[in-house]
UniProtKB/Swiss-Prot annotation:
Main location: secreted
A GO cellular-component term linked to this record: extracellular region
Similarity comment: Belongs to the glycosyl hydrolase 2 family.
Catalytic activity: Hydrolysis of chitosan or chitosan oligosaccharides to remove successive D-glucosamine residues from the non-reducing termini
Molecular function, one GO term: exo-1,4-beta-D-glucosaminidase activity
Localization: Secreted
Organism: Arthroderma benhamiae (strain ATCC MYA-4681 / CBS 112371)
Designated name of the protein: Exo-beta-D-glucosaminidase ARB_07888
GO terms for biological process, alphabetical: chitin catabolic process; polysaccharide catabolic process
InterPro entries reported for this sequence: Beta-gal/glucu_dom_sf, Beta-mannosidase-like_N2, EBDG/EBM, Galactose-bd-like_sf, Glyco_hydro_2_Ig-like, Glycoside_hydrolase_SF, Ig-like_fold, Ig_GlcNase
Keywords of the record: Carbohydrate metabolism, Chitin degradation, Glycoprotein, Glycosidase, Hydrolase, Polysaccharide degradation, Secreted, Signal
Enzymatic class: hydrolase
EC id: 3.2.1.165
Length: 882
């Protein structure tokens, strides 16, 4: 059975250190319908405040010695903003350990701001919270608006009618943020991903807003449609819903009026009357029909047209609230659990194979549109289509960007702490839930669902991660999602350990691995391997080693020496110290055995990039190859996309936004049309992730030894089918491999255009896996593949020509002048003035291997602020600058 799911400028106040000077400034809000962010905060530890909270909550108190920060930020983010701590210093080596926990863990912090208001007759003021971690007392002008027992939960958003507390002229808002405990509170933590921030994310991490209205207050609009591909195509019925609240003292008759605005200057009016008694709240619906709707598609499948719903509330001809705006897209999500107990998704009627990775927030929960835009550009550049947010829902801007770019989002709550404090959870550390947690969970789910509802990028919400919620919590979550007209999948967890009665099995598997496994693992038929079928909700080989220039930014000379001389040492920039992943012992054992003991940091770094490229490419390729099997793969989430701070694993690009070999392994493995090598079957698979491309294809298969001598040459031909994979033929000549051979697959269409170029380095014998002794994070290897003959490769002479095309593009020509391969050529774009690596940077390909006398051309784009030069190096290619 298929489950069908049917379906928004902040003014800056110029503030001096003397807060009382704010009074003459223009009002923060002054007209009905105006909605503004509290523009900034004065921050101080309660431990360093001599005055009472009560007195500090009145206008005019002197807080000139407090820290001044922006409109949202945790305590640590605010202290960094003020230069109390320096990020470069904090992140270097183990300096993070020196942060004084005593200043944070048991201490509340005060956020204070003054602003001007000019309240008038019949006007009402509402305070909106969206994320205070994890509890707060809220005061306005000496009145406690809410206690920590009400304002509780890092994701719980609330609205407070503060009309009776506002003053004409200066006003003061004071929020006391209580210290967060991940195991006790419904907060947002980092599990074992990295060291915990000393403040545990305490503070006003999302905006606080103030709105002005008449007696009728509106919620943001929600939008549902009856769009069904193949059923309703020429017209779509659309419903706009809003929650209308009479906060006045008498019965009011009024109307909601607005428009649906489309991309082609479409403007359709919508309206509905209402009658509300004092204090009453109703959900009002407005219906209209859109002719020939513009349908929203994931990035590689089509365009991302967006509509806008705009509504206002009127009492007679007087506006009481609005306009409230939300952008939305018209699309159709379906999900089901198939006969193999695997979840399958469809988007607009097409089978949607998830290729994604797990996102991490910044360690101090800092957020910028610029950074998330770059991260999402990298996601698309790698060929991925989905990002998983495990308890890291971030801010509305993230979903706006995903909508515009066509990236699907799987959101949900996090594992291992209080969110999963269930009696049957034998692996987590969270305290058990009590009666007070369920209302917080309800408020959290309502708020997040309201924020996400109109976003077409939402694919699913996971109400559990490693463990499913109990039936009481499940009912609360599902009721809240449905109350907010949820139009995407609701999934009980990311694993198959169990499920709540209401939702049934999740169809997702969480069988690992999380640490290194060889490329051949992914073509196996057990656990997390693709041959076992399924949807891998979080899995990977634990790779993501930054290149040396990045390592030097956060590791000392001794730290870097430890990397290659002490393979079993616990490393501070791995996972948290209590984690299984606190060292690189499993990874290094394989590196030493497969590629040889490193003789320098440079040697270690190069071999690590080889390991990482192999690891990510094989994972994405195996899952793609087996998506058309009888027990199909339906998607995977690589663990992880990006780090919360500078780290040594679980990433596809580093903290400084520099792509690594793991990035380009992914980019190769996730190509929309692709030819891949199955390590287990020694065969070629033809992959098609597009929803429309078809026709004749050819794969040229070449196998050579390390001296460049041909071992086999053949051409395989087949017709490709959209959204399908197919096995072609076995690779010939592998029996002639005496040490290490190179395999090149070149996929072309019927016009001879190259669609994919893919090079493997293959040992004489593959790694031997000990499946029977697998753990939740790793499958041991009893015999490692021998790739050490690569060290015998003769130096290759590679000619490099560059053609700079304007200020943001360059074409690079690489030609191997030698009679043997030029292996694993790295291209690094540097700023001419500083010598620093250019980021963000988008290469068509990188870490490439050239056949004897082969020539290829690669393009690169980058920000126009840089004058660039190119560094070229490789496994057997001398480093040079061009």
């Amino acid at each position: 059975m298929w489950f069908v799911f049917r379906p928004a400028a902040i003014p800056a106040l110029l503030l001096t250190l003397g807060v009382s000077a704010l009074s003459p400034l223009r009002p923060l809000v002054s007209t009905a319908g105006q909605h503004e962010v509290i523009p900034g905060w004065y921050l101080q530890s309660e431990r360093h405040v001599s005055s009472s909270i009560f007195s500090l909550s009145f206008p005019g108190a002197d807080v000139s010695s407090w820290y001044r920060m922006g409109p949202r930020g945790t305590v640590m983010a605010g202290l960094l903003e003020n230069g109390v701590y320096n990020e470069t210093h904090l992140f270097f080596s183990d300096n993070f350990k020196s942060l004084p926990d005593a200043d944070f863990r048991d201490v509340s912090w005060l956020y204070r701001e003054e602003f001007t208001l000019q309240p008038g007759s019949g006007q009402h003021f509402t305070l909106h919270t969206h994320g205070i971690s994890s509890r707060g007392d809220i005061y306005l002008n000496g009145h406690r608006v809410a206690s920590k027992d009400v304002q509780a939960g890092s994701y719980a958003g609330y609205q407070y009618d503060v009309t009776k507390h506002v003053l004409k002229g200066g006003n003061c808002l004071l929020i006391k943020a209580y210290p967060t405990n991940y195991l006790r509170d419904l907060a947002l933590g980092f599990v074992d991903w990295n060291p915990y921030p000393p403040d545990n994310g305490t503070g006003i991490w999302r905006h606080v807003e103030l709105s002005q209205s008449g007696p009728i207050r509106l919620s943001s609009p929600r939008v549902t449609t009856d769009f069904v591909p193949g059923v309703r195509v020429n017209d779509t019925n659309l419903t706009v819903k809003t929650d209308v609240h009479n906060i006045g003292q008498e019965t009011i008759r009024g109307s909601i009026k607005g428009f649906i605005e489309g991309a082609q200057n479409q403007r359709q009016p919508i309206s509905a009357p209402f009658t509300l008694k004092p204090g009453e709240q109703q959900t009002i619906e407005m219906n209209t029909t859109i002719q020939n709707p513009s349908v929203w598609w994931p990035a590689s499948w089509g365009d991302q047209p967006l509509y806008t719903a705009r509504i206002s509330a009127f009492v007679g001809k007087i506006k009481s609230d609005g306009p409230k705006r939300r952008k939305f897209g018209i699309r159709h999500i379906e999900s089901r659990v198939n006969d193999q107990d695997t979840v399958e998704f469809k988007v607009n009627g097409k089978p949607f194979f998830v290729m994604g990775a797990g996102y991490s927030s910044d360690i101090f929960l800092r957020f910028t549109v610029e950074r998330i835009t770059t991260i999402f550009q990298y996601v698309l550049d790698m060929g991925m289509n989905t990002v998983r947010l495990e308890g890291k829902q971030e801010h509305p801007e993230l979903y706006d960007i995903a909508d515009k770019m066509g990236i699907m989002i799987i959101s949900g709550w996090e594992c291992c702490d209080h969110w999963e404090g269930w009696k049957y959870n034998t692996e987590g550390f969270g305290q058990p839930w009590t009666d007070v947690d369920y209302p917080i969970a309800n408020s959290s789910m309502l708020h997040e669902a309201r924020m996400m509802q109109t976003h077409p990028s939402i694919l699913a919400f996971l109400i559990g991660s490693d463990y499913w919620p109990n039936d009481q919590a499940t009912n609360i979550y599902v009721d809240a999602l449905r109350r907010m007209d949820w139009n995407a999948a609701i999934i009980s967890s990311a694993a198959k350990r169990g499920f709540p009665k209401l939702l049934g099995p999740s169809g997702m598997k969480m069988d690992g691995p999380y640490d290194w496994v060889p490329p051949s693992y992914w073509f196996g038929d057990r656990l997390g391997a693709a041959g076992a079928g399924g949807f891998g909700s979080e899995l990977g080989s634990g790779v993501g080693t930054p290149e040396i220039r990045s390592l030097k930014k956060f590791l000392s000379e001794e730290d870097m020496k430890d990397l290659w001389t002490k393979p079993n040492k616990v490393l501070y920039h791995m996972s948290a110290g209590v984690s299984q992943f606190r060292d690189r012992s499993i990874y290094n054992k394989a590196l030493y055995a497969r590629y040889g003991k490193p003789n320098s940091l440079d040697d270690y770094s190069l071999k690590a990039q080889l390991m990482d490229y192999e690891a990510t490419r094989s994972e994405y390729e195996a899952y793609a190859a087996y998506k058309s099997h009888s027990n199909p793969t339906t998607g995977l989430i690589y663990w992880m996309l990006n780090p919360a701070w500078p780290n040594l694993h679980w990433a596809l690009f580093d903290y400084y936004l520099k792509p690594m070999a793991s990035y380009f392994g992914t980019k190769t493995g996730a190509r929309i049309e692709h030819a891949i090598y199955d390590y287990r079957e020694q065969a070629v698979y033809l992959i098609n992730h597009s929803n429309s491309r078809s026709g004749a294809r050819s794969v040229t298969v070449d196998l050579i030894n390390i001296d460049g001598k041909s071992l086999s040459h053949s051409t395989m031909k087949a017709d490709t089918t959209p959204l399908m994979s197919q096995k072609l033929s076995k690779v010939s000549g592998l029996d002639k491999n005496r040490d290490v051979s190179f395999l090149r697959l070149i996929l072309k269409d019927d016009a001879g255009k190259v669609l994919s170029r893919n090079v493997y380095w293959l040992p004489q014998r593959e790694d031997v896996l000990d499946w029977g002794n697998s753990t939740w994070y790793h499958t041991p290897v009893t015999e490692y593949a021998d790739l050490t003959p690569l060290s015998k490769l003769r130096k290759a002479d590679v000619r490099v020509d560059i053609n700079i095309q304007g200020r943001t593009k360059t074409r690079v020509s690489l030609q191997n002048k030698s009679n043997h391969p030029a292996f694993f050529i790295r291209l690094n774009l540097l700023d001419k003035a500083s010598g620093d690596e250019v980021t963000p940077v988008f290469w068509e390909d990188n870490y490439v291997t050239l056949w004897p006398h082969e020539r290829i051309e690669l393009g690169v784009t980058y920000p126009q602020t840089h004058r660039v030069e190119l560094e070229v190096s490789g496994y057997n290619v001398e480093k040079k600058m061009v």
